[in-house]
Amino acid sequence: MANIFENCSYHSPYEPYYLNCTNTTNQCTLVQDVETIESIIFWIDFLIPCTLFVVACFLNAYYLSILVPEFTEMNDITKKQYIFMVSRAISALTACVIMLALRILQLITSSFTIYFLFFLIDDLSFYSLLGSYVGSAILLYLATIRPILYSNRISVRTVYKFAIANLITSVVLAITTAMFQAADLSDGPFQCDLKHCQPITNMIMLVLILTSFLIPIVTLSFVLVTLCFYKNRSESIGDFTTDNSVSKSARTRLAWTLFTFTLITLTEAIPSFYLVGTSIGQLLSTWILCAHCYSIPEYEKFGYNIQKS
C-alpha cells in the first residue's frame, strides 16, 4: 500500500496513525493540524497541573508552618485530635512536590520507572488521605459519643500506632496498584496489554477504587448521622451534660470533612476510571480514527488524544 503522506513537504510523527485514512485529498494539511492540536493539548495538560501543584505546595507548606509549632506545644489529650491532621498535611505536601517533579521528568523520559514512581506517589497520597479521613472521623465519634472511652482507652501512642498502620497499608496498596498502572502505559518487568493481564487488572483496579471510595463515605456519613441523632436524643430527654458548642463544632467539622472528601473523590475518580477504561480507547477501529481526522473543524473544537506507543 502506498504511503499517502510520501509527497508531503513536511512529515509529522502522527502519520503512522493515519496511513489507512485514504478518503481524503488534503492529508498533508490534516496531519499538520492534528500535530498542532496535540501540541496544544500537551502543553495545556502540562501547564495547568503544574500551576495547581505549585499553588497546592504553597498552601500545604503554609498550613504546616502554622500547624506543626502548635502541635508540638499541645498536651497529649489535644494531640490525639491532630495527629491525623498533621499526617494528612505532610502527605499532601510530599505528594505535591514529588508529583510536580515527576511532571517535569515526563518531558525527558517515559520509562517504566518514571510511570511507576508517578502512580506510586499518587496512590500513596490517595490511600493515606483516605485513611486519615477515616481515622479523624472515628476519633471525632469517640470523643463526642464515648468521651470516657476516648479519655481512658485511647492514648496518644494508640493514635500513633493507627497512623503508622494506615501508612503501611497505604504503601502496600500503592505498590501493588502502581505497578500494574505503570505496566499499562510502558514496557516493564512483565507484559500487561489487552491480550495478557490488562482485563483482569482493570477489574481489580475498579474494585479497589470503588471500595476505597465507599469506606470513607460510609464512615463519614455514619458518624455525621450518629452525631445528629445524638443531639436530637439529648434534647428530647433534657440531657444537657454534653457541651452544645463542642457537639455543634464536631458536626460542622465533620460536614466540611465530608464535603472536602467528596471533592477529592471527584478529582481522583475521573482519572482513575479513565485509566480503568483505557482498553476501550485502545480498541478504537480505524474508521473511527479516520472520521475524526476527516472532520477537522470538529476535531479542532474538541481535540482527540491519541495514545502513542
Curated annotation (Swiss-Prot):
Membrane topology: Multi-pass membrane protein
Keywords, comma-separated and alphabetical: Cell membrane, G-protein coupled receptor, Membrane, Receptor, Transducer, Transmembrane, Transmembrane helix
Family listed: Belongs to the G-protein coupled receptor 1 family. B0244 subfamily.
Chaperone recorded as keyword: no
Protein name: Putative G-protein coupled receptor B0244.4
Molecular-function annotations in GO: G protein-coupled receptor activity
GO CC terms, sorted: plasma membrane
Domain of life: Eukaryota
InterPro entries: GPCR_Rhodpsn_7TM, Put_GPCR_Chromadorea
Compartment(s) of residence: Cell membrane
Upper lineage: Eukaryota, Metazoa, Ecdysozoa, Nematoda, Chromadorea
Transmembrane segments: 39-59, 82-102, 114-134, 162-182, 204-224, 256-276
PROSITE patterns listed in its UniProt record: G_PROTEIN_RECEP_F1_2 (PS50262)
